[in-house]
Amino acid sequence: GVGFGKDALFTIWRWIIPRRVWYNINHTENAGADAHHRPVNLTAAAMCRGRTMSALTFSTQEGRAASIIIKGVFTMCTAATYTTDSFYFGRNLDYEFSYGDEVTVTPRAYPFSLRCMGDFRTKYAMIGMAYVAGEYPLYYDAVNEKGLGIAGLNFVGNAVYHPAQDGKSNVAQFELIPWLLGRCATVQDARTLLDRMNLVDTPFGEGLPVASLHWMIADNHECITLESTKDGLHVYDNPAGVLTNNPPFPMQLFALNNYMQLSPKATGNHFAPNVPLNAYSRGMGAMGLPGDLSSQSRFVRAAFVRANSRSGESEAESVSQFFHILGSVEQQRGCCELDNGKYEITLYTSCCNADKGIYYYTTYENSQITAVDMHKEDMDGTELVSYPLVKEQQIRWMK
């Protein structure tokens, strides 16, 4: 997404630039429905050099020229599922700045043009967080009207996409979420399509590298992880119901063996029965639970918190509990410093009631929960519906 403002220098995520995009010129000041958009025409000035690309040049309708810096992205994210009376699916997206993300509803029969397989129209409507490039929703996470959810998380250094293969469904990384959610009602449906799918190394725009991702795919019955590595496409059962970044998922899951002694219950003296040891604090059954922000530690912590979370069955109680689960691995400004002197933070946390099609979210600046109900939109419409994020902190003053 474009780093929004009136200056001539912007920052853009590396794989979502089309020939023509829209940017929100009042992103910070006007995040509501009145946000103003202007078209921008982009032309690539140079190819990618290592981890940082050279500038792109663009001109606005007013004819002014400016430069855009493109950088590699190492987002540290966490996705999770949770079930009470309904099924919930969501994630934290962690990075140092926002790309202009919006909650976006894609209606049924919406046209997509796949790079290798031509045009198709979605069978099911979907809602999620996306950057909309032109009329193309580039989803980070989404759920369709049947209750199937998908989230893409960074997988740098291990994700490998391959050339197109005859006899395969050749899908680009940025096409995966709408392709699966537009056609599949369940994880089992997705498994069937994945059996003959090949993730291809096709970028969204010319001269732009693809995003290195892996995905969590879930419904109210099962959860899987999808990874494309140098030895091919892998679909793993995900009994933990969470996903972070590196290492590859089998290693993340195996690491839970090191923590099987953890318990939410009070601990006894198993160290030395003859030594007088006392549990001097509540919570000591979970001594050793990781608390740092590395992806492996976040996987363990999120898996433990999710597995032991208890919630009431109401919508309000369930949604609140889901945000608490992901809150256990959120990032605060100042705790994860980057090489450029900036800090990675949890830009947004999402929680979608997949059964009802309600997408809840909070942002770093606004801890109040905001919601969009996809069923209140025209799901048989012809256009995307997007809602800019409400980022200004909402405080309820008591009188």
Feature annotation, model-predicted:
Residues 57, 61-75:
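Short, Lys/Arg-enriched N-terminal segments with co-localized hydrophobic residues
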Residues 27, 37-38, 42, 59:
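Short hydrophobic targeting helices and cationic amphipathic motifs
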Residues 74-168, 201, 386-388, 394, ...:
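A contiguous strand-loop segment
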Residues 13-15, 22:
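Tryptophan (W) side chains
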Residues 70-88, 202-205, 210-211, 220-222, ...:
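C-terminus-biased signal that marks the final domain/tail of proteins
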Residues 196-234:
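Catalytic cofactor-binding cores of redox enzymes
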Residues 167-203, 315-323:
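Proteins synthesized as precursors that undergo proteolytic processing into mature forms
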Residues 8, 21, 35, 54-55, ...:
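Short, low-complexity intrinsically disordered segments enriched in A/P/G/S/L with frequent Arg
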